[in-house]
Amino acid sequence: MSSSSVSGIREAFLDFFEKQGHTRYPSAPLIAEGDASLLFTNAGMVPFKQRFITGVSDVKTATTSQKCLRAGGKHNDLENVGYTNRHHTFFEMLGNFSFGDYFKETAIELAWRFVTKELGLSKERLWITVYSEDQEAFDIWKKITGYTDHKIIRISTSDNFWSMGDTGPCGPCSEIFYDYGDGVPGGLPGTDESDGARYTEIWNLVFMQYNRDESGELHKLPRGCIDTGMGLERIAAVMQGVCDNYETDMFQAIIDRSRSIFGSHDHPIAHRVIADHVRAASFLIAEGLTPGNEGRNYVLRRIIRRAVRYIYQIVGDKFSLHEVVPVLTREGSAGYMGNAYPEIVKAEQSIVSTLKIEEDGFADTLRRGTGILEQEIRGLKSGEVLSGEIAFKLYDTYGFPLDITLDVAKERGLKFDEDGFNRCMAKQKEQSRKHWKGSGEAQTASSHILNKHKATSFVGYENHRVKSMVKEIFCSGEAVTSMGEGEEGIAVLDITPFYAESGGQEGDTGLLKVVTTKCGSVAEVVDTTKSNNVHLHKIRVIRGTLKVGDVVEAVVDKQRREKLRANHSATHILQSVLRTLIGEGIQQKGSLVAADKLRFDFSHALPLTKEQLRTVEMEVNRQIMANQPVIIDHCSLEDAVQEGAIALFGEKYNDQNVRVVSMGSSKELCGGTHVRFTGDIGAFRIISETGIAQGVRRIEAITGHEVVSSMNRDSESLQQVAECLSVPVDQVIEKLKKVFVEQREINKKMATICYTHMNSCAKCIEVGSEIKLYVGEFSNIPVEVVASYVKEKMHTNEVLAISTTDGKRTTFIVGVGESAIKRIKATDIVKALQQIQGKGGGNASIARASLPSEYSAKAAEIIRQTVIDAIQNSGA
């Protein structure tokens, strides 16, 4: 076989069976078409299921490399990914199929020929299993392999008897195992130690010869069918001499990319998870799936979020899973999958944007949930039990995925109280069911509040601190009279200065200080939301006890509030400026007003140009520096709209009384908190402008001190550049231009020298034809220079194969002239180099290949022989 790379093995398998008369089919989609019993295609035979069931087929034999996914439903490997050598969510299944054509003997003979002849595996390393009652298969294997009885193992369990379901086609199966040798733990198939890695199943051959009826009785089929499956990742590991799928060339390329982005820290499991999950997510998104909360969409969301959680484990808040994608979609890497699945290349932009949106949306949930979980397990030792109630609270209250809780528990060696979690889940479902029926029993906290309390008196526009009374406390959804230190829950006050999350603005945080007792009890307000205008203060008691009836001093985190004010007011000005400068048709599609940044989503078909962004930024800052007053008015909705106030589409307003916020050119209906003068914003800086959906753009920006910090960082970087160039800061651009001009001149001179050297040293090799083959091996000449030389020197009847090496890898640039192309293509030569680990691509006239430098001499001979063979085969 020419190459042991993943792509090389895939092609070798398909080519082998194609030559045996099989029809090569492209992979079916991962989203199983027309099969309600499956979430995803999870085996190679799935696309042919109806052919097996009905016995009707327009072809008799077929071969495929099928994309498969096992993450959800009956076949779910998600939780094991990263912890074992062989579990994957996404994988490729090589298979050959017979629909009433050949049967056992031919299937076994073809399989044996492929693994021993095509792959070149030693028969001493191979073992066979058969179903204990399948004497026919045993005899065929013995005849074809020449094995003694002990090398063909009889298995009596269901592992060696396959069925499509409770009824329908079924039959015994036979497996080929590879023995990695004494250095790897594990026992023979069928033994207690068979779970070890030493003996690895590489191919499963299913002989469908029966039909099982509803009573369970087996009936012989008139014509047997064959369904085989060979995991590409497993056989690649065998061929590459490793017993870990994640050490194969494809996975190593993805893992290397992951390490380059997130750092080569000691987190091997995390990088494995990232490598596996980015493949799965990318292929699902390429098929049009988007993250969601149900069915297949939820499985995609789980996969992405699990990967993000492992990224968080490595580097904290750098959520950049999307940056790994190019290793799959761009040529030049062993991780490239576009040659077999071009759809992933076409969908690159969609994949990247979808991943980024999901990462951003999950970031806050992950940070908060991880912090709470760490607090809960801090005192637990390995072997102890993580409470199911805690896991459920994280899941239910904070939206923290159970998968991630289980992963953390597994890493810490903790057991998990699954029964406790299920009890909480069942209780919640019962509560929801009763509430839906209107029974009034076991009401949830929010429904209890709606029935008992009037709207909270909000005084936060004018005050940061007020005295208030605790009217109600809820813990785990139940009304309680008090909460002790360390407990979390919800407090309802009669008066509050805390702004509740609304209109994109995050809720206030701060403290509740008990003043009715001398114990100094304090609760931290970690978030504020509202239900039917009743403010719900999410609290954690940090000292003493908080009781219903306590008088508290409610204190808003003033510094955070001021940042929120600035960002909210800046968002208003930004929208007004966009409508003025870019287009009146712009509509708000979403927003986030956080303490550290603002985000504004708006309708617009095209990306904003650099000049447009610069103009927008300057105009926003002009209005800030004008220090205009922010005016708050109340009027009817009709009057506000007539005065030109912007109302958010789909938002519900009080027709008789709306709050109108005006500043500079902006006039909007808004209930949020704002600065008193635009100058209080300080400054405004756009940090990004991106597309998040078709026709929707997103601007992210910072204000105030964040702008100063950002500019200081930029200034420091510029100063460092100036020091490196030994010029004042104001001369950096001119100096760089001069350096670039000088570098281009140096490059030209270097290219001239290199051209002269290559001209004098390149040799013409005899290939027995009027076609001339020129080869040359050089050291440390830039690849771009070699490529330019080949393009310039390539004549109509010539083949050039010029290489350059850095001592570790050698890159060949192959050029084929216009007449010579009729007999050999540049890509034919590059493909021939795959047998010595050559990787690359190109077109018929010019291509490149990179390979380990120790194979350089052998490469020259392969090139020569490839050209000679091509000339002879063309009849020259």
Curated annotation (Swiss-Prot):
InterPro entries: aa-tRNA-synth_II/BPL/LPL, Ala-tRNA-lgiase_IIc, Ala-tRNA-ligase_IIc_anticod-bd, Ala-tRNA-synth_IIc_core, Ala-tRNA-synth_IIc_N, Ala-tRNA_ligase, Ala_tRNA_ligase_euk/bac, DHHA1_dom. GO terms for cellular component: cytosol. Binds 1 zinc ion per subunit. Its cofactor is Zn(2+). This is Alanine--tRNA ligase. GO terms for molecular function: alanine-tRNA ligase activity; aminoacyl-tRNA deacylase activity; ATP binding; tRNA binding; zinc ion binding. NCBIfam families: alaS (TIGR00344). Zn(2+) binds at H568, H572, C670, H674. It is an enzyme of class 6 (ligase). It is found in: Cytoplasm. GO terms for biological process: alanyl-tRNA aminoacylation; negative regulation of DNA-templated transcription. Keywords: Aminoacyl-tRNA synthetase, ATP-binding, Cytoplasm, Ligase, Metal-binding, Nucleotide-binding, Protein biosynthesis, RNA-binding, tRNA-binding, Zinc. Belongs to the class-II aminoacyl-tRNA synthetase family. Consists of three domains; the N-terminal catalytic domain, the editing domain and the C-terminal C-Ala domain. The editing domain removes incorrectly charged amino acids, while the C-Ala domain, along with tRNA(Ala), serves as a bridge to cooperatively bring together the editing and aminoacylation centers thus stimulating deacylation of misacylated tRNAs. The keyword rRNA processing does not apply. It comes from Anaplasma phagocytophilum (strain HZ). Catalyzes the attachment of alanine to tRNA(Ala) in a two-step reaction: alanine is first activated by ATP to form Ala-AMP and then transferred to the acceptor end of tRNA(Ala). Also edits incorrectly charged Ser-tRNA(Ala) and Gly-tRNA(Ala) via its editing domain. Its EC number is 6.1.1.7. It catalyses: tRNA(Ala) + L-alanine + ATP = L-alanyl-tRNA(Ala) + AMP + diphosphate. PROSITE patterns: AA_TRNA_LIGASE_II_ALA.
